[in-house]
Regions:
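Conserved N-terminal segment of class I S-adenosyl-L-methionine
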Residues: 1-103, 117-120, 125, 144-185
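Short acidic, S/G/P-rich loop/turn micro-motifs used as interaction or catalytic elements
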Residues: 93, 110-113, 137
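A short beta-strand submotif of the Rossmann-like class I SAM-dependent methyltransferase core
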Residues: 103-109
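Conserved residues at the C-terminal ends of beta-strands
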Residues: 107, 116, 133
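Helix-to-beta-strand junctions that scaffold the AdoMet/dcAdoMet cofactor pocket
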Residues: 113-114, 127
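Conserved beta-strand signature within the Rossmann-like core of class I S-adenosyl-L-methionine
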Residues: 127-139
Length: 185
């Protein structure tokens, strides 16, 4: 595992993959992210430790900055890098935290990983509250980087091994939907 260094001045373009900065810019005012932020705030009002898994350089950890919590970003290639954020570049399935987290977030990641069940169960193992999102019922082939579309509640239950404590479907004005689920210990 390597620690990310200083913040990058320009986004790194990866062959065939969307630029994380552009990805965030296009989505930062979405209904989905508004809902995800409100759900995180409702779930953990005073967290002491928050980790975002699969950050892809997006600043969702900033939602928790005023809480004074320890902030950790973990991504296989591009963790979020900012002052006061512990940025980890590693494979989540190989990550073994010394302690559990009050809040674990994982937004738009499970549909990309080869073994979503192992990934989902590890999310549950490292945190007291897990907030996760996936594209909701997107047709197979809509996004060439998604390995598991369509994803719905049934598939999520299979991956997590249980029902969530609650779910919310965030539907954009263009009918693109995302499923946000909360799992508590």
């Amino acid at each position: 595992m390597k620690m990310a260094g200083s913040a990058e001045k320009a986004p790194v373009k990866r062959r065939g993959k969307p630029d994380p900065k552009t990805y965030w810019q296009r989505r930062r005012n979405s209904i989905y992210l508004f809902a995800a932020r409100q759900i995180c705030a409702r779930e953990r009002r005073n967290p002491t430790a928050v980790i975002d898994i699969g950050s892809n350089a997006t600043p969702t950890l900033e939602w928790h900055r005023k809480s004074g919590a320890r902030l950790v970003s973990l991504d296989l290639r591009r963790p979020y890098v900012a002052e006061g954020v512990e940025s980890l570049t590693c494979d989540f399935l190989e990550y073994n935290p010394a302690t559990s987290y009050d809040l674990v977030t994982c937004f738009q990641v499970l549909e990309h990983v080869p073994d979503p069940a192992a990934f989902a169960r590890k999310l549950l193992a490292i945190g007291k509250t897990v907030v996760v999102s996936v594209p909701y019922k997107w047709k197979k082939g809509r996004c060439k980087y998604h390995l598991h579309d369509p994803v719905d509640e049934r598939k999520m239950k299979k991956w997590f091994g249980r029902d969530p404590d609650y779910s919310y479907i965030a539907k954009e004005l263009n009918n693109v939907a995302r499923l946000i689920q909360v799992y508590r210990q």
